[in-house]
Each structure stands twice: as structure tokens, then as C-alpha cells.
């Protein structure tokens, strides 16, 4: 089976969940104050909202939502919480798009392996781990705009640069496990270079002086 990087998490969903995914994606891209989606469980809605943001790092301006529902309706009203005003979102989107394109231009003529090394080196040298864990540090605007990010923000920055350079890449996630002392999810990347799949964890590397962690998936 061939893995698909574009809308990777979308393809993990069932038919009804895909409809919600699409509605969330469109609503966030249009920066709507609220929009209607199929009534699913709170857990499903939360997971889908998260999946949209994993597949689409360019949606960096909303990390959570609330919703209203009515007992006799098959729909719920989903209300995104935005990190910035509408005008600021437009401004930041243009800035991030320009930033990504300028960086990609520096590597567009390189081989796949060289492109991956370029992205790796850029993140390791220019992004610091944000111990304060600000909300924007989970997004590309933290990594590419402010030079600080947590694992999620770094992994999304890697993905959006890989997407721009035509490299297969997804954001991979581990589960939280409080019973074993694992309080938070960890995010890294799975990439495909010359037909082979690798794990790439730039967060690990920023803590270990740029030591590369790129492990082939057998």
C-alpha cells in the first residue's frame, strides 16, 4: 500500500468524519467565526480539528474551539478560537507564505537528500525549544516567525518546507500516557527520501547539539 502524504490524516477517517474534516478545513481557511458540522462525539471533533492542523501547517492561527449543539439536530455549530485578529491572520499568512517560498528557493535545485539536510540544518540552527510553551510555539509561526517552538511547531515547519519542496512528509505523533509518566504527545516527522521512509526528529536534535536522528523504516 502506498502511503499518501497529502491529507494523510484525512485518509484515516470514515465517511462522516471526512465530511467534518473538510468542513473544519474550509471554515478555518476562510477564517469563519463559526460553521456547521455533522454532530459527532466531542472526542471525534477534537481529534479531527487536530488532524486538520497536522495535515495543513498553514492553518497556524487556531488551536482550539468550542461548539453548540441542539438535541434534535444532526449538526453542531463549531466556533474556532483564533490566536489573532482577522487582519493579523491575513498579515501573518502572507509573511509565512513568503518565508516558506524564500527558504524553498534556496534548495529547489538540490537532490531529495540534500533538500532534507537543508531543512534539517535550518531548523536545528535557527529554532530553539520554547520551554514556556506559548500557544504559537505549536505552530509554524513560532518556528519560522519567532525562532522558538515545541516539538509540534518544529515538525509542522519541517512538513510545510518539505511540502513546498515536493518531499513526501507527514507529522507523526505519539500518544500521551499519564500512567507511565508521559504527560504530552510528542511530534516528529516521517519523510520519504529516494523511495525509503525515515523518522526525523529535529526536536531531539535541537537538544543534542544538532546530532542528526534519521532512522530508516524497514
Region spans (language model):
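Linear, non-domain "peripheral" regions
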Residues: 1-98
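Short, well-ordered strand-loop elements centered on a beta-strand within folded domains, enriched
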Residues: 76-78, 142, 146-148, 196-202
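Secondary-structure boundary elements
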Residues: 86-144
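Intrinsically disordered, low-complexity coil segments
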Residues: 102-106, 145-146, 175-184
Amino acid at each position: 500500500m502506498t502511503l499518501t502524504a497529502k491529507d494523510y490524516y484525512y485518509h484515516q477517517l470514515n465517511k462522516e468524519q471526512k465530511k467534518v474534516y473538510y468542513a473544519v478545513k474550509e471554515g478555518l481557511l476562510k477564517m469563519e467565526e463559526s460553521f456547521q458540522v455533522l454532530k459527532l462525539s466531542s472526542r471525534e471533533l477534537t481529534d479531527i480539528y487536530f488532524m486538520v492542523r497536522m495535515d495543513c501547517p498553514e492553518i497556524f492561527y487556531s488551536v482550539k474551539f468550542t461548539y453548540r449543539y441542539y438535541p434534535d439536530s444532526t449538526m453542531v455549530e463549531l466556533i474556532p478560537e483564533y490566536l489573532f485578529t482577522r487582519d493579523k491572520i491575513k498579515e501573518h499568512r502572507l509573511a509565512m507564505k513568503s518565508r516558506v517560498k524564500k527558504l524553498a528557493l534556496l534548495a529547489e535545485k538540490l537532490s531529495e537528500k540534500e533538500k532534507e539536510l537543508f531543512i534539517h540544518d535550518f531548523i536545528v540552527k535557527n529554532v530553539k525549544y520554547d520551554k514556556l510553551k506559548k500557544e504559537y510555539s505549536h505552530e509554524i509561526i513560532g518556528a519560522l516567525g519567532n525562532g522558538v517552538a515545541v516539538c509540534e511547531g518544529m515538525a509542522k515547519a519541517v512538513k510545510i518546507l518539505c511540502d513546498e519542496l515536493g518531499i513526501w512528509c507527514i507529522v507523526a505523533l505519539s500518544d500521551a500516557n499519564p500512567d507511565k509518566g508521559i504527560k504530552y504527545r510528542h511530534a516528529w516527522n516521517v519523510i520519504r527520501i529516494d523511495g525509503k521512509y525515515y523518522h526525523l526528529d529535529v526536536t531531539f536534535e535541537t537538544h543534542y547539539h544538532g546530532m542528526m536522528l534519521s532512522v530508516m523504516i524497514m
